[in-house]
Amino acid sequence: MSSITLALSKGRIFEETLPLLAAAGITPTDNPESSRKLIIGTNRPEVRLVIVRATDTPTYVQYGAADLGIAGKDVLIEHGGAGLYQPLDLNIARCRLCVAVRKGFDYAAATRPGGRIRVATKYINSAKAHFAGKGMHVDLIKLYGSMELAPLVGLADAIVDLVSTGSTLRANNLEEVEDIAPISSRLIVNQASLKLKRELIQPVLDAFAGAIKP
């Protein structure tokens, strides 16, 4: 019997995906937050979940190790989206990609045309495109976490990072100075899988589409 595999990451995306899965009649048999299993069955024998790092979701789907996945727009921009069909913005895990600096830093002066600043981020492609559009020279420093520390210790003038409430920025004496893009999670589908397994995948797409909240 044909089957489909859905790639998900732990945490907020998984929790906010549960109502969408329920709308498609899919119930996981384990909770990845409490289980060490990386492959999780469901109440439907033809559907299984694989638990991956958020940044790896597009790669699993691109190469067909998973037929579908749910990934943030930020991750998809960095990945490039090659080989992926992106039919739905699920409107979950919403936040924004923004530029933040130390309070008191003159960002307007630093970002005049011809200016040059140093920016720490894990979103290299997004940051590069944003500052290139402003006609700026920018030195990008790749970090994987604790972005807020970089301006405080002189590693960078600014950071590009995801922001939800802004409380972490405020706690570290930083402030948002520019929005780059609104971010939410998207359903992604392997293009070959959509052709070969449409009878299994299309009902999931339809159920998800009907359950998306504005």
Swiss-Prot record:
Q: Which top-level enzyme class is recorded in the Swiss-Prot or TrEMBL entry?
A: transferase
Q: Reaction catalysed by this chain?
A: 1-(5-phospho-beta-D-ribosyl)-ATP + diphosphate = 5-phospho-alpha-D-ribose 1-diphosphate + ATP
Q: Which Pfam families match?
A: HisG
Offer an example of a GO molecular function term for this protein. ATP phosphoribosyltransferase activity
Q: What is its EC number?
A: 2.4.2.17
Q: Where in the cell is it found?
A: Cytoplasm
Question: Which superkingdom is the protein from?
Answer: Bacteria
Tell me which UniProt keywords the record has, alphabetically: Amino-acid biosynthesis, ATP-binding, Cytoplasm, Glycosyltransferase, Histidine biosynthesis, Nucleotide-binding, Transferase
Pathways involved: Amino-acid biosynthesis; L-histidine biosynthesis; L-histidine from 5-phospho-alpha-D-ribose 1-diphosphate: step 1/9
Record flagged with keyword Transferase: yes
A Gene Ontology cellular component where this protein is annotated is:
cytoplasm
Note whether Nucleotidyltransferase occurs among the keywords: no
List, in alphabetical order, the GO biological process terms annotated in this UniProt record. Answer: L-histidine biosynthetic process
The entry describes its oligomerization and partners as: Heteromultimer composed of HisG and HisZ subunits.
> What is the role of the protein in this entry?
Catalyzes the condensation of ATP and 5-phosphoribose 1-diphosphate to form N'-(5'-phosphoribosyl)-ATP (PR-ATP). Has a crucial role in the pathway because the rate of histidine biosynthesis seems to be controlled primarily by regulation of HisG enzymatic activity.
Q: Which NCBIfam families match?
A: hisG
Family of the protein in this entry: Belongs to the ATP phosphoribosyltransferase family. Short subfamily.
Domains: entry comment: Lacks the C-terminal regulatory region which is replaced by HisZ.
Q: Write the protein's name.
A: ATP phosphoribosyltransferase
- Species, as recorded: Azoarcus sp. (strain BH72)
